[in-house]
A protein has these predicted regions:
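Short, extreme N-terminal segment that most often corresponds to the first beta-strand
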Residues: 1-44, 140-142
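Generic structural motif
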Residues: 10-14, 44-46, 80-82, 104-106
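Charged interaction segments
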Residues: 53-142
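Surface-exposed beta-strand edges and their flanking turn/coil or helix-capping segments
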Residues: 20-24, 46, 103, 112-115
């Protein structure tokens, strides 16, 4: 069964790409998409960029430039060594961040058709609250 799941985080003020990635990185999120960094500077152009892991600062700079130019930019992040994660969307307004959990998704043991929202929330709320998080909206639809 295909599901549409996402998390939308809102902030009190515009938050930069570096602010988000620094906070998430300190908590255990890494830009490791099977050994490389995968990101979109402009989601609308459809072409993903890939870089070696040691070129993370250059990827962040490109993401920041994309958002500053008015584009929705994304980067794949995973939780430490689990490979669980997804695509994090950065919006030009800077007051919103979205996660589409598409990599090795965690489902509930008692209801495996549903995403384990708590698994994700327990790894995201702390670091994002530290940079001004004011709200979260989740969706899990068949």
């Amino acid at each position: 069964m295909s599901r549409d799941t996402d998390f939308v985080f809102t902030f009190a003020r515009p938050i930069g790409v570096s602010d988000v990635l620094d906070a998430l990185g300190a908590a255990g999120w890494v830009p490791d998409d099977m050994g490389s960094i995968t990101y979109h500077i402009d989601l609308e152009d459809g072409d993903a960029q890939q870089r070696p892991m040691d070129e993370f600062p250059a990827a962040v700079a490109e993401l920041e430039q994309g958002v500053a130019a008015g584009h929705i930019s994304t980067i794949m992040l995973t939780w430490r060594d689990t490979g669980t994660g997804g695509s994090f969307f950065f919006y030009p307004s800077g007051d919103r961040l979205m996660l589409a959990p598409i990599l090795n998704t965690r489902t509930r043991a008692d209801h495996p058709d549903f995403l384990d929202l708590e698994w994700y929330m327990s790894r995201l709320l702390g670091p994002l609250a530290g940079i001004g998080l004011t709200g979260v909206e989740t969706t899990d639809l068949a």
